[in-house]
Amino acid sequence: MRSNNNNPLTRDEILSRYFPQYRPAVAASQGLSGGSCIIAHDTHRIVLRRHHDPDAPPAHFLRHYRALSQLPASLAPRALFYTPGWMAVEYLHGVVNSALPDAEELAALLYHLQQQPRFGWRIALSPLLAQYWSCCDPARRTPFWLRRLKQLQKNGEPRPLRLAPLHMDVHGDNIVLTSAGLRLIDWEYAGDGDIALELAAVWVEDERQHRQLADAYAARARIDARQLWRQIRLWHPWVIMLKAGWFEYRWRQTGEQQFIRLADETWRQLRMKG
């Protein structure tokens, strides 16, 4: 269901107009980006998501809704409703574990996603990195950051190994173990891109876990494991800069200390690697 109202409504207006029998239940923890609440009627629950990024155009939020509308129930919650500034999606009953599932299970989930039809819009990291630089706190801009940004822009993004739909925010808190298997939530960064970019961006604990995931995916996708790992490593500096820039971006937007701590730690990792 999609509404054509062009003016963003408040949460209470959304509830009274479209979900009059529902009431707020608890806040939804869906990754670091937030912007969600759970509404309930008797035992039925729905996740109500708000467009929480004031710097992102409304089209980005609409893409999120369209991605969920395209995806099968074996991968993601169903999209239920959209109006400018808000969407409602199915609440997935299950267990969320901050740790990633084992390599074989996660590789199977990502491979299943990447066998789906493409979304129809490409993920482009270079303009996103430039946006994070321009939108961050000016006091946080450093010569090191600018040098790394210019070097990546000069080199250009790696040529894709294989284009497919990507989730681009795969970590334990965005994976729900339901009675029917693993499902991914929080699809706001989804788009089409290189499968190796998705694997490079997974929030792994260490290189050993990363290699296990890459090898499991290569076996399932029938790709040479060494070739896939080389491609993942080509994307690695882009992904680290993406994470650092996003933390800076969210720090400027929210002032929340968790983001500045994460940004500082990511910059330290980059400096250690030269």
From Swiss-Prot:
Pathway: Cofactor biosynthesis; thiamine diphosphate biosynthesis; thiamine phosphate from thiamine: step 1/1. Pfam families: APH (PF01636). It comes from the Bacteria. Keywords: ATP-binding, Kinase, Nucleotide-binding, Transferase. It catalyses: thiamine + ATP = thiamine phosphate + ADP + H(+). Its EC number is 2.7.1.89. Transmembrane segments: none annotated. HAMAP family: Thiamine_kinase (MF_01604). Belongs to the thiamine kinase family. Catalyzes the ATP-dependent phosphorylation of thiamine to thiamine phosphate. Is involved in thiamine salvage. This is Thiamine kinase.
